[in-house]
């Protein structure tokens, strides 16, 4: 993990922490409207979403509500160890979520998870601290999503018939670095698409 990444995180976390709730809410609604129009969203049966932090990132309640309304199976992450997470299924009327040390709701780990019983993840919605227009992502530095995506891809490759995971980042306008590339290393996963409040950027 380079100093440059840490510097970017510090700068972005400081500015994002100052964003008013109404700005985050407005941008989150715009992002939700674009995500649910993606062809990958429309055709997926299983979708991996995330429960947002109290501040600093796109709010996902709208996406979760739409996914349930459309009859999709919804999976959200639970951190189960150092740099390790799993995606567990949650249900519309669930009361089994707990709050972790980062203030994020997560499942209790007792339901079905992706890769159990050949369960595919066709679409994963990925948070982050910063993004660039070349579909690079800067996370929080723990490697949870990079490690999980790598593990899923290895599993899907072995199974051959399993669905490829389409990776969509969602970000506030303030999280985009328009004139700067995020430093990447061999473990970092590129996105397939990035949805901002104003546009969709795809890996063509």
Swiss-Prot record:
It comes from the Eukaryota. ATP binds at residues 5-9, 139-146, 188. GO terms for biological process: folic acid-containing compound biosynthetic process; tetrahydrofolate interconversion. One of its GO terms (molecular function) is 5-formyltetrahydrofolate cyclo-ligase activity. It holds the Pfam family 5-FTHF_cyc-lig. Its EC number is 6.3.3.2. Disulfide bonds: none annotated. GO terms for cellular component: cytoplasm; mitochondrion. Keywords: ATP-binding, Ligase, Nucleotide-binding. It catalyses: (6S)-5-formyl-5,6,7,8-tetrahydrofolate + ATP = (6R)-5,10-methenyltetrahydrofolate + ADP + phosphate. Substrate binds at residues 57, 102, 140-144. InterPro entries: FTHF_cligase, FTHF_cligase-like_sf, NagB/RpiA_transferase-like. NCBIfam families: MTHFS_bact. Belongs to the 5-formyltetrahydrofolate cyclo-ligase family. This is Probable 5-formyltetrahydrofolate cyclo-ligase.
